[in-house]
């Protein structure tokens, strides 16, 4: 049966001001392990390779899976990340390519080259939907997916919502574009945005319409993934509630919510959603079996 693994971002464990009690990298690993996460994601925009390598013993000590979020601009940048992925036995490398080619054809050639190199090194890579990257634009990315049918996608919709200044309710053309992305999603990242803010507080009343929208998107994406996934496939969902300046702060510089608590809230939402989909499939199978007996 397909499995859900929820990862927490080490970058999100940056305590900021007033976010959560973690005071060290090791304490962050302990918190994540004790909270029942399957693994931790290293963000190479927040730490260089040397600093990231220092976390290797903690992955072993706390028996957590590893995801690497990388920001290469060339094949020369990709190669050391693939080496690191092998040494960390990373489940996947999320590529946020720091290149924005002018044409889909040019982008598709780059993506295929990087995919081929990763395949040679036996490393699983996915391209994350992210601003200021090869997947910067929603429409451009759907065209790129058509050009590269085997391109794997790690979907963070928060970037497209704020990039396009999306308003609710969605227009039909927006719904169709988001649906194309969700149909190709191989993994998901958890952050909720609006058309004006990249990261919203999860429990503020004024943000609930966006919470509902993102939960609807994640449910649709999960359903698409489960339909095409092998019976032993694993879906990775990464909670990534980032520190300031992603997180909003008041005039005193203090964050307006506790991101660690919000990560646990989001983790609970995703677990509940997954269980509901599993229950639906089991009930549907039982019904079909009864009809054939």
Give the label of every model feature segment.
Residues 1-86, 90, 268-293:
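N-terminal pre-domain/capping segments
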Residues 2-13, 40-42, 64-70, 93-95, ...:
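Hydrophobic faces of well-ordered beta-strands that scaffold small-molecule active sites
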Residues 10-12, 44-46, 72-74, 97-101, ...:
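Active-site-proximal loop/turn and secondary-structure-junction residues that shape catalytic pockets
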Residues 15-16, 162-165, 192-207, 233-252:
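Flexible glycine/acidic-rich beta-alpha junction loops that bind and position SAM and/or redox cofactors
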Residues 22-24, 79, 105-113, 138-139, ...:
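Charged helix-capping and loop-helix junction motifs
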Residues 65-153, 162:
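Active-site acidic/histidine proton-transfer and metal-coordination neighborhood
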Residues 120-205:
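Acidic/histidine-rich catalytic cores of soluble enzymes
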Residues 173-176, 210-234:
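A short, acidic, amphipathic alpha-helical segment used as a generic capping/interface helix at domain edges
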């Amino acid at each position: 049966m397909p499995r859900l693994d929820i990862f927490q971002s080490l970058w999100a464990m940056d305590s900021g001001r007033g976010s959560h009690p973690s005071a060290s990298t090791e304490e962050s690993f302990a918190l994540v392990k004790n909270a029942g996460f399957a693994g931790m994601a290293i963000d190479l925009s927040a730490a260089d390779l040397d600093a990231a390598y220092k976390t290797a013993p903690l992955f072993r000590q706390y028996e957590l899976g590893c995801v690497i979020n990388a920001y290469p601009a060339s094949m020369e940048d990709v190669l050391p990340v693939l080496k690191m992925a092998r040494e960390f036995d990373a489940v996947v490398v999320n590529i946020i390519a720091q290149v924005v080619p002018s044409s889909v054809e040019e982008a598709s050639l780059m993506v295929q080259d990087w995919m081929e190199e990763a395949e040679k090194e036996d490393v699983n890579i996915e391209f994350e939907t992210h601003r200021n990257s090869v997947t910067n634009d929603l429409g451009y990315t759907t065209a790129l997916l058509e050009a590269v049918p085997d391109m794997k996608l790690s979907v963070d919709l928060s970037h497209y919502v704020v990039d396009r200044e999306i308003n609710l309710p969605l227009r039909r053309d927006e719904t169709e574009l988001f649906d194309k992305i969700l149909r190709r999603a191989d993994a998901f990242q958890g952050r909720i945005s609006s058309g004006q803010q990249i990261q919203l507080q999860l429990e503020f009343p004024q943000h609930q319409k966006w919470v509902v929208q993102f939960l609807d998107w994640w449910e649709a994406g999960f359903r698409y993934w489960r339909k095409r996934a092998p019976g032993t496939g694993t879906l990775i969902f990464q909670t990534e509630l980032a520190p300031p300046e992603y997180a909003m702060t008041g005039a005193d510089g203090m964050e307006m919510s506790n991101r660690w608590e919000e990560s646990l809230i989001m983790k609970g939402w995703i677990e509940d959603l997954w269980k509901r989909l599993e229950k639906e499939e089991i009930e549907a199978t039982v019904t079909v079996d009864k009809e054939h007996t």
